[in-house]
Amino acid sequence: NDMLSNDLLYINQGDGTFHNEAARYLSYQSRASKGNDIADVNNDGLPDILSLDMMPDDYQTLKRTVNGFNYLHYAGDEEFGFEHQYMRNMLHLHNGFNNDGMIPFSEIGQFAGISATDWSWSPLFADLDNDGDKDLFVTNGFPGDIRDKDWTKIKASAAGSLTTELALSEMAPRLKIPNVVFENTGNLRFVRKDDWVKEVPSFSYGAVTADLDNDGDLDIVVNNINDKAFILKNRTVERSPGNSSFIRIKLKGSK
């Protein structure tokens, strides 16, 4: 959930009902949670959880934007019974089950190197280079960067004036930025690979992976606001067929 309301982690109770166990299983959460994905990032057979936020990935933008968190927020969470939230991507690593059946997740987003990707929406875990590890693709961008401190001052000064909400929104900077891809290098570490995908600034939201041309590697389809969709062709098998592993299954029936 975005901002005040906490994220929810519904665990199947085995009796046809689900119960929110986020407070027990997760030590803390992303604050302005956007998209999420669940995948086994370290190939231990257990599902890990990634939730995206909107923390800038460069120093200049970070200092130019509203952080969204201070001690008053922290104290408010304590006072009103909310779980603690921080404005960055969270990667919750599944540590297996303890004696009472609880899943003790560890949050490792900063350790893994994927905690800051700017205003992000859809994360996709997928083995993009066919090496057996799940890599990460993240969509980015927003038509109006309402985190910008100059814009927040303009909005505050316009209170009580005849300036319309539409006019104010059009004053916000356009956050048209490239999407991001990370290579899973093993040992719970990810490395940003700008050479894997051409850096095209966009307002990208939804995305999906599929082997569109049946060549054995996963392509990516990205949906954009006010622009054409992207189809990102994966050339892993084409460029390095000897170092690429995949399984092709052909079904043969009686008819």
Question: What label would you give each PLM region?
Answer:
Residues 1-255:
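Acidic, glycine/proline-rich Ca2+-coordinating loop motifs
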